[in-house]
Regions:
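Terminal targeting signals and extreme-terminal segments of soluble enzymes
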Residues: 1-139
Length: 139
């Protein structure tokens, strides 16, 4: 299942095969108006030279899941990331990364989202907050 499967985000299905999240191997586990959960099976191409997951992989997984959460509230409206702040807490080199995104604050055209990436269900590897802007609000 690509990052943007059927359901509320059905209109994103065709485009999902061309997204960066799909390219890196991110898979959607669940998505509703309160939380998005995605996962990524760590492969050697996700590593940096230290043979741990590259920080850009965490950032991409977080940005994709957090952005999808905002997009669920504004179907067919472009959403962009205006800020992404991340803390890397623990390295990972094998296993499955699980990303959970939830709202912190919602306003009319801007939203603040929190995302956490775990190795499995309990080892926190990265924590992020992000601000997102809806470029074209529905009429």
């Amino acid at each position: 299942v690509p990052m943007y499967p059927g359901g509320k985000v059905e209109t994103e299905t065709d485009a999902s095969a061309r997204t960066f999240a799909d390219f890196i191997g991110a898979k959607l586990v669940s998505a509703d108006e309160h939380e998005v959960v995605a996962e990524l099976s760590i492969q050697p191409h996700h590593w940096n030279l230290a043979r741990i997951v590259h920080g850009g992989v965490y950032m991409s997984l977080l940005d994709s899941a957090m952005g999808l959460l905002v997009s669920l509230h504004y179907p067919n409206c472009p959403v962009v990331t205006t800020n992404l702040n991340i803390h890397f807490t623990e390295p990972a080199s094998e296993g499955t990364l699980v990303c959970r995104a939830k709202f912190i604050h919602r306003a009319r055209s801007t939203m603040t989202v929190e995302g956490r990436v775990y190795l499995g269900e309990d080892r926190l590897c990265a924590h992020a907050t992000g601000s997102f802007r809806v470029l074209k609000l529905p009429s």
